[in-house]
Each structure stands twice: as C-alpha cells, then as structure tokens.
Curated annotation (Swiss-Prot):
Organism of provenance: Francisella tularensis subsp. tularensis (strain SCHU S4 / Schu 4)
Protein's UniProt name: Isoleucine--tRNA ligase
Motif interval(s): 'HIGH' region: 58-68
Main location: cytoplasm
Residues noted as binding L-isoleucyl-5'-AMP in the record, renumbered to the chain: 558
Family of the protein in this entry: Belongs to the class-I aminoacyl-tRNA synthetase family. IleS type 1 subfamily.
Keyword Metal-binding included in the entry's annotation: yes
InterPro entries in the cross-refs: aa-tRNA-synth_I_CS, aa-tRNA-synth_Ia, Anticodon_Ile_BEm, Ile-tRNA-ligase, Ile-tRNA-ligase_type1, Ile-tRNA_ligase, M/V/L/I-tRNA-synth_anticd-bd, Rossmann-like_a/b/a_fold
Length: 935
C-alpha cells in the first residue's frame, strides 16, 4: 500500500481550531489601540451620510454589570452594521457623573459636606471619584470590543457640558416653561431632597391602616343634611388612612358631591360612610348590630365642620373630585402639604399650608405632641393617642405598593416645599410632547403607549434639588416677591461662560455681586439641578452642538425602564428648549434575568458578571449571547445558557476554519474563476450566500440581532456544514491542486468567507478580526473599514439550475440521508461511501436528478448512484417523504480506493497505482485532472 498523503490537498490555515478567546482578545484589543482603529474608521467614512446612535449615559459608580454590557454591545453591533452599510456612524460614549450616589460614596470617606469637609473640597472629591469610576467602566466597555471615541467621551462633569446645561436652562426659561411652586413632591429623608418621577420606584410595604373618627361639631347641621330633625348622640366622619403620621397636618375632610353617604347608628354614636362601602366597612369593624338611619348626597355634607381628632381645631368637609367609593370609607383625610390632591383642594379653599415635617423626616418644632420625632416611628404613638382619645375606630396592617427612593430603597413621603418646575401645562409642553411621541418610531410598539401614558399623567417636573454635588440652578430671585431677576437669561449666559472655564465651582465659590449689582434686592438660589436634567440635556449639550454628530439622533437604545427615565427627560428638555424631539427612533431592550426569570441578586447568588464571562469564555461569547437573545423581552443568562452559546460559537468557528483551511494556496488575483464558468454547485453556494446576505442586511437594518444570529448559524450549520461543505470535501482534497474543479470551489469559498466575515464582524468582533487576518484578500483595509461584500452573484432569471432547483435537490438528499441512516442502524453499511444508492423517481423527480448525470453520486457522497424510473422499483426500496420517490440502499462490493476512499471497479486498473481508482490516477498524473460540471 502506497502513502498518497502528499498527493492530497490537505486543509491548512493559521486560524486555530480553539478560540482561546480570553487570552487572544486582549492582544487583538492592543492591536486596535496601536492601529488607532476608531480614528481610521472616522477618517475613512468622513463625508458619508451620518447615522447617530446617541448613548444614554450610565451612572459613573461601581463596576459595570451584565445589563450595562448588554446595552453597550447592542449599540456596538448596530453601529458596526451601519458602518458596513456605508454610513458615517460615530459612537461617543457618555457618563452621568453628578448626583446622590457619588455624594454618598464620598461621604463614607470624608463625611458630610459643610461639616467634616468644606463644600468646595467635597465637590472636588466628588469630581475625582467620578473620573476614577469612569476609567474603571471605560476599561470594561473597551474589553467587550466596543469601539468608540473613548479618548473624548462626554462626561456631565466636563466644564463645557456643565456650561451647556446652563445655556439649555436659559432656553427653557426664555421659552416660558419654568415655574416656581410650593407643591408636594416625592421627598427622600435619606437624600434630604426632592425626587423626580424617574427616581421613584414602587415596592411592597406593610403600613398601618386605620379608621379615624372626626367628631362633627354641629350636629343640627348634620341632622338637616340627612333630612332628620335632630341627633341625640355624637356623630363622627370616618376617614381611612395608611399614613397616620400625616394626621397632624390634617386641615379638611373630602367627600364627593355625587356620592351617596349613609348615617349609621352604632350603640351610642353615629358614623358617616359612603353608602356603597357600608357593608364591607362594617364587616371590617366586625360590627353586626348597626342601623342605617338615613342617606344623603355628598354636596349636602360640604361646609359642615368637624373636630381634629387630637388638636383643638376645626376642619371643614369639602368636595373633592378625587374622592371615590372604591375603597376606604368614601371620606378622605386631607393634609395639603402631603399629597397632590390634598394640595389642590387646599389651594382651592385657602387651607393652611403650615409645614409640620422637616427635610430629615422629623416633625418640626411647631408640631404639638410630636416635635422632633421621626414620622414613620411616630405612627404607633399617633395610633396610641387616637385610642386614648377614643378617636380610633379600627386599626389594622396592610401590605401595599408604596413609593421608595430608587437609591436608598427607603419609603418616601409627599412633602410640600418651594421647588422649581418645568411646567407641563405652560406653553402646552404636555401636548407638544405627546405629539412628538406620535411622530417617533417606537420598538417594541408598546413603548409608544407606555410613554404616552406616563407623559399624559405626569406632574410638572421638579428640577430643583437640595444637594451639594450637582450643576447649580443659578437663578436670582427678588427677596420679597420671589420673582426672577429681569435679566435672568443674560445672567445665565454669564454664569455659563464662567462655568465653561472653571466648572460648577465658578458659581458656588462666587459672590452674588459677580453676576448682579442689585444684591440688596435679589438673592441667589442655592439649589442644584435634578441629575435627570443632566442626562436629559444630552441632546442639547452633545447632538445639537457637536458637528461630528447630528440632531435629532437617529436612534436611542436603552433598557425598558427608560420610558420613565431618560427617554422622557430627553424629550421634555428638547421640546422645552428646542421645540422638537431629540430622536427619530427609540428601541428598548429587556432586563437581564437568570434562567428562572428572576432578577439578578447577590442574595440569590445568581449574579453573572461580564468580567467573569470575558475572563473565562471571552467577550465574543457574551456578544454572541447578547445578539442571539431576543432583547425585546427579558434576557435570560446563566452558566448553562452561556455554555450553549459557547457550543454555538464553536460551530461557527469550525465553519470559518474549514473555509479558510481550503483557501490554502489560493491567490484571489490570479485564481478567481468567473461565475458563469464555475461548477454548478459552486454557483449555487455563491447565489445562496447572496440570498442570505440580503436577508442579513435587512434584519441588521431593523436592529433584529437575534434574527441575524439565527441566519448566520443556519447558514453555517445547514447550508454550508450539512450540504455544501460536506459535498465539496472530496473535490477539495482529491482533485488536482490547480485544476478547475478545485479552483472553482476555492473561488466560491473565497466569496463565502468575504461575506461571512462581514456578517460576523458586528457581533463576533474579535473572531472576525482573526478570520480577516487569515483570509486571502486584495485590500489592506482592516475589517472595521470594510462595507458589505459586493462580489456575490445571483442566478440569472432564466437559469435552469437556480436556487429553487437546488432547494429540491437538498430535499431529495435529506431523504437519501434518512434512508442511509436506517441502513447504518441495520448494519448494512457503516459509511455512505460503502453504499450503492438507487433512486426510483417519477417523471418530475427523474427530470430533476437526470440533469446531474453521473455526478449525482458526489452530491449524495456515495461511491455509486443510479437513477431509474419509478416503475422499476423493487420491494426493498423505501418510500421517501417526497411524492414520486423511492430509495434503495445496498452495500457496494467493489474495492476501496486508498486515496479517495470511494469503492470503484477501476481500483487497480493502472498497474503503477494498484490501490487507487482511475479518477485518482487522473488527478495525480494528468495536467488538468478530472473535470466536474455539477458537483
């Protein structure tokens, strides 16, 4: 037996089988850094049509989590796909750097501002801390393969950004959207500050639920309201509340004019309840012997006075539209400084707006009985006092959804304070924003209804904060009237100039006289701006001013929680400052959860960190998982899920390696064969690749990365792995090295690789770079500067063997493989090359297969394949799952060729080559080698 190894075209490539990504990726990153790859992309695509994806700033505090990674990877995939489509698609990373979380971190080390450290030094430490956090996060984002202008990111602490925020505020004021108000706002006692809607999250809380008796002062008026002559016992209006701590601030009881109310006798007193709530309320009280005396409407109760349950003051019964008979008692305790509806009613009736609770959550000195106590701790004392005064009708506990601070996770209170607001009604901002939402494309489509509902119902935006670390609200107000200084716009621009030079310290360290001359009449506002105003201003501070970008952005892409956050604040700032929406399209992705759908939590031990993933499996595995997951809903990740992703990656890598290994020795300048002269199967491979590329570009343009990933995987495993590459192995390995059949396949492979590497590049950025380095090419451009491959061809419309034809051949081949597997299991054959395949076909299928002539066997990877009419079928033939087709498999008895492993009667025909077939002899000894037309 001779050794024919040297006569075979064995695969060879520098592209390794093992990814070893965790070790290779840092080296590839280092190469990109040295190449200045992002700068080269910008130079190469300068002047092209722009595509701007505006980066929503992550908060500069702590290492990135997997949610951050998903967000940046999705953005990177979209940017890279747009670059492949020929757009100038810059990516400028941004960071949110002011606000409470950074303050808290600095407080841990240095203490509170103004106490153990000066406010000026405190701000310097905050700035230093934020910059350090940015560098930590930046390193992680870069490690994920995300390309961007990392050397010039936009930080909200950049002096120019801070200055442009002030200029944006000036435009908002100039357009008439700013208002000052004394209103109830969500207040965090731990923050010591008001919170915006976006900073409020809801969580379950157990609260006291009490029914309180307000004694009616004038029983005669009450009797008259119920159509009675008189009442011989005391009567009480019953209110139900889950916030006993607000009772010291009670100034009224609200009823609804349209509701019916019942007067009920219980032993020796009367109570008033909404008629529809009588039965369930008495059941709650466990009272069975009550007697309904009379019924009246709410409008007849208004104006009647009641006694406060523990203070010596009287409170009126008033009409309130917000009162319903869905729950409670139908009578509502009203504390104007602790609720929006209460406040509205209080303003309407000129009720006292005395403040009983300080910013730290403790009662003020003017609060009788409870001065200095923390409100939530005072609940028990208040309930006890009500019991002592016989004003407690019922006491219970209730678990309900309650607003909490997004940062501290502690319960909030509504507290009326003087604040600055962007008004939703002045200048019609709400209506304009709602119209802008309609003019924006939202995906998923439910995003539109979600943000519409939020904007429709939201209160005015409280933009003032009582914090140290933030951009100032640099206003001057009259000491008596509290009106804005008449030159406010001019002053703001003056402040902005100073901040652009020296940062926000230029305001905080300045004297008022540096900005105004009338210091005797005007005082400066000491508040800072809501941190959501920082990020919400990014369209004005970045897109509208940076000539490298454009306004509005083509795309915003963030987590689904940003409908109430950045999407909304960006819209409100842009509409109030510029009068147009900041984005054309808004896409959202779901939250990352574990395989059981649970939120990531250290306590559950289910946290998957991006650092662990890229240090073990590699960033490309994380990128592939991100792309493969339908990000419109929750995105499940776990070690098991990532293991499956790694298996998929290996299949893709193996396909790429097989393709590259069969391009050894191929010169694209001299060896390319024209499409019309290729073997027909190679024509199909190129046309099929073109079909897939068209689909892939289409779904990339729709940001459907999971569909892209599915198409790439299907292409590699089914169209290539299970069909084309399986068939051409024989031709690639055994045909004449420089012969037409092999060069034809290499031409097809060359085109396939050039298309495939581009499809992969946005997702598998590191691996695509590695593939590109191992690919024969006629360009020196790095893969990041390439556009979609244009060397693919489609079949002519009149082509006989078109894609439809080959799809039918694939179906027939699948059926043959099914029958081969049956015969393997029956031990008739061990491999397909041992099989003699006879296909019995009806006229239609016969005509299809006949076109392939004696090359049918190569398509079926068998040593012998015969085609016969169906009428000649034998009893041993097996019906295919295709009408008009039967398949018979027998074991071939002819000798095995030691070179190609086909069984052939021609083995030994040539005395010089006794152990190989005549086809192999031809490939070894002749100049042209064998010829192929179809396969």
């Amino acid at each position: 037996m001779s050794d024919y190894k040297d006569t075979l075209n064995l695969p060879k490539t520098s592209f390794s089988m093992k990814g070893n990504l965790a070790n290779k990726e840092p080296m590839i990153l280092n190469k990109w850094e040295k190449q200045g790859i992002y700068k080269k992309i910008r130079e190469h695509f300068a002047g092209r049509e722009k595509f701007v994806l505006h980066d929503g700033p992550p908060y500069a505090n702590g290492s990135i989590h997997v949610g951050h990674a998903v967000n940046k990877i999705l953005k990177d995939i979209i940017i890279k796909s747009k670059t492949l489509s020929g757009y100038d698609a810059p990516f400028t990373p941004t960071w949110d750097c002011h606000g409470l979380p950074i303050e808290l971190q600095v407080e841990k080390k240095h203490g509170k501002a103004g106490q153990s450290i000066s406010e000026d030094d405190f701000r310097k430490e905050c700035r230093k801390y934020a910059k350090k956090q940015v560098e930590i996060q930046k390193k992680d984002f870069k490690r994920l393969g995300v390309l961007g202008d990392w050397e010039q990111p936009y930080l909200t602490i950049n002096f120019d950004y801070e200055a442009n925020m002030i200029r944006t505020l000036a435009k908002i004021i100039e357009n008439g959207h700013l208002s000052k108000g004394f209103k109830p706002v969500h207040w965090c006692t731990d923050c010591g500050s008001a919170l915006a809607e976006a900073e409020v999250e809801y969580a379950d809380k157990v609260s006291p639920a009490i029914d309180v008796k307000f004694k009616i002062k004038d029983k005669d008026k009450l009797a008259q309201a119920f159509g009675l002559d008189s009442l011989n016992h005391d009567a009480f209006a019953i209110i139900w509340t889950t916030t006993p701590w607000t009772l010291p601030a009670n100034q009224a009881i609200a009823v609804n004019n349209q509701l019916n109310y019942s007067l009920i006798k219980i032993e020796d007193f009367y109570i008033i309840l909404a008629e529809n709530l009588v039965e369930q309320t008495l059941k709650r009280y466990a009272i069975e012997n009550a007697q309904i005396i009379a019924t009246t409407t709410g409008n007849k109760l208004t104006g009647i006075m009641a006694e406060h349950p523990f203070y010596s003051r009287h409170v009126p019964i008033l009409h309130g539209d917000h009162v319903t008979d869905d729950s409670g008692t139908g009578l509502v305790h009203t504390a104007p400084t602790h609720g929006v509806d209460d406040f509205t009613l209080g303003k309407e009736h000129n009720l006292s707006m005395e403040i009983f609770v300080k910013g730290n959550g403790c009662y003020s000195e003017n609060t009788k009985l409870f001065a200095g106590e923390f409100i939530f701790k005072a609940n028990d004392r208040i309930i006890e006092l009500l019991g002592e005064k016989k004003r407690l009708m019922n006491s219970d506990k209730i678990k309900h959804s309650y607003p909490h601070c997004w940062r501290h996770k502690t319960p909030l209170m509504f507290r009326a304070t003087p604040q600055w607001f962007i008004s939703m009604e002045k200048q019609g901002l709400r209506d304009k924003a709602l119209q802008a939402i309609k003019e924006t494309s939202w995906a998923p489509s439910w995003g539109q209804a979600r943000i519409e509902g939020m904007v429709k119902d939201r209160p005015d935006w409280c933009i003032s904060r009582q914090r140290t670390w933030g951009v100032p609200l640099p206003l001057f107000i009259h000491k008596e009237t509290e009106e804005l200084h008449p030159n406010t716009i001019e002053i703001l621009h003056k402040v902005a100039e100073k901040i652009e030079k020296d940062g926000i310290e230029a305001w905080f360290n300045a004297d008022d006289c540096e900005f105004i001359t009338e210091t005797a009449q005007y005082k400066s506002v000491k508040d800072t701006l809501d941190v959501w105003f920082d990020s919400g201003s990014s369209s004005m501070c970045i897109l509208d001013l940076d000539k490298r970008l454009s306004y509005p952005a083509d795309l915003y892409l963030e987590g689904s929680d940003q409908h109430r956050g950045w999407f909304q604040t960006s819209l409100l700032v842009a509409m109030s400052a510029k009068g147009s929406q900041p984005y054309k399209e808004v896409f959202t992705h779901g939250f990352v959860v574990d395989e059981h759908g649970r939120k990531m939590s250290k306590s559950l031990g289910n946290v998957t960190s991006p650092q662990d993933i890229y240090n073990t499996l590699g960033a490309d595995i994380l990128r592939l998982w991100t792309a493969s997951t339908d990000y419109k809903s929750e995105m499940a990740v776990s070690d098991q899920i990532l293991k499956r992703t790694a298996d998929t990656y290996r299949r893709l890598r193996n396909t790429a390696r097989f393709l590259l290994s069969n391009l050894d020795g191929f010169n694209p300048v001299t060896d390319i064969i024209e499409f019309d002269k290729l073997v027909k199967l190679d024509q199909w491979a190129i046309a099929k690749t073109k079909e897939f590329q068209d689909k892939i570009i289409e779904v990339y343009d729709k940001y459907q990365t999971h569909t892209v990933a599915q198409l790439i995987h299907h292409f590699c495993s089914i169209e290539m792995g299970s069909f084309y590459l399986d068939i051409i192995k024989d031709r690639q390995y055994t045909a004449k090295t420089d012969g037409h059949p092999r060069k034809s396949a290499q031409t097809a492979i060359y085109h396939i690789v050039h298309a495939l590497v581009r499809w992969m590049a946005p997702i598998l950025s590191f691996t695509a770079d590695e593939i590109w380095d191992a690919t024969p090419k006629t360009t020196d451009l790095p893969i990041q500067l390439c556009e979609w491959y244009t060397g693919l061809k489609s079949f002519d419309q009149d082509a006989e063997l078109d894609l439809e034809y080959w799809a039918k051949i694939q179906e027939i081949r699948s059926e043959v493989n099914r029958v081969l597997e049956i015969k393997r299991n029956e031990d008739v054959i061990k491999a397909s090359l041992e099989a003699e395949i006879t296909i019995y076909a009806d006229k239609y299928n016969y005509n299809l297969l006949e076109k392939l002539g004696n090359e049918l066997r190569f398509l079926l990877i068998s040593s012998k394949a015969d085609l016969k009419v169906i009428e000649e079928s034998t009893s041993s033939s097996i019906a295919a799952n295709i009408p008009g087709l039967l398949i018979e498999i027998t074991k071939i008895e002819e000798p095995k060729c030691e070179r190609c492993w086909h069984r052939s009667s021609t083995v030994g025909d040539n005395p010089q080559y006794k152990d190989i077939c005549s086809r192999c002899v031809e490939n070894i000894t002749t100049e042209a080698g064998e010829s192929r037309e179809f396969a």
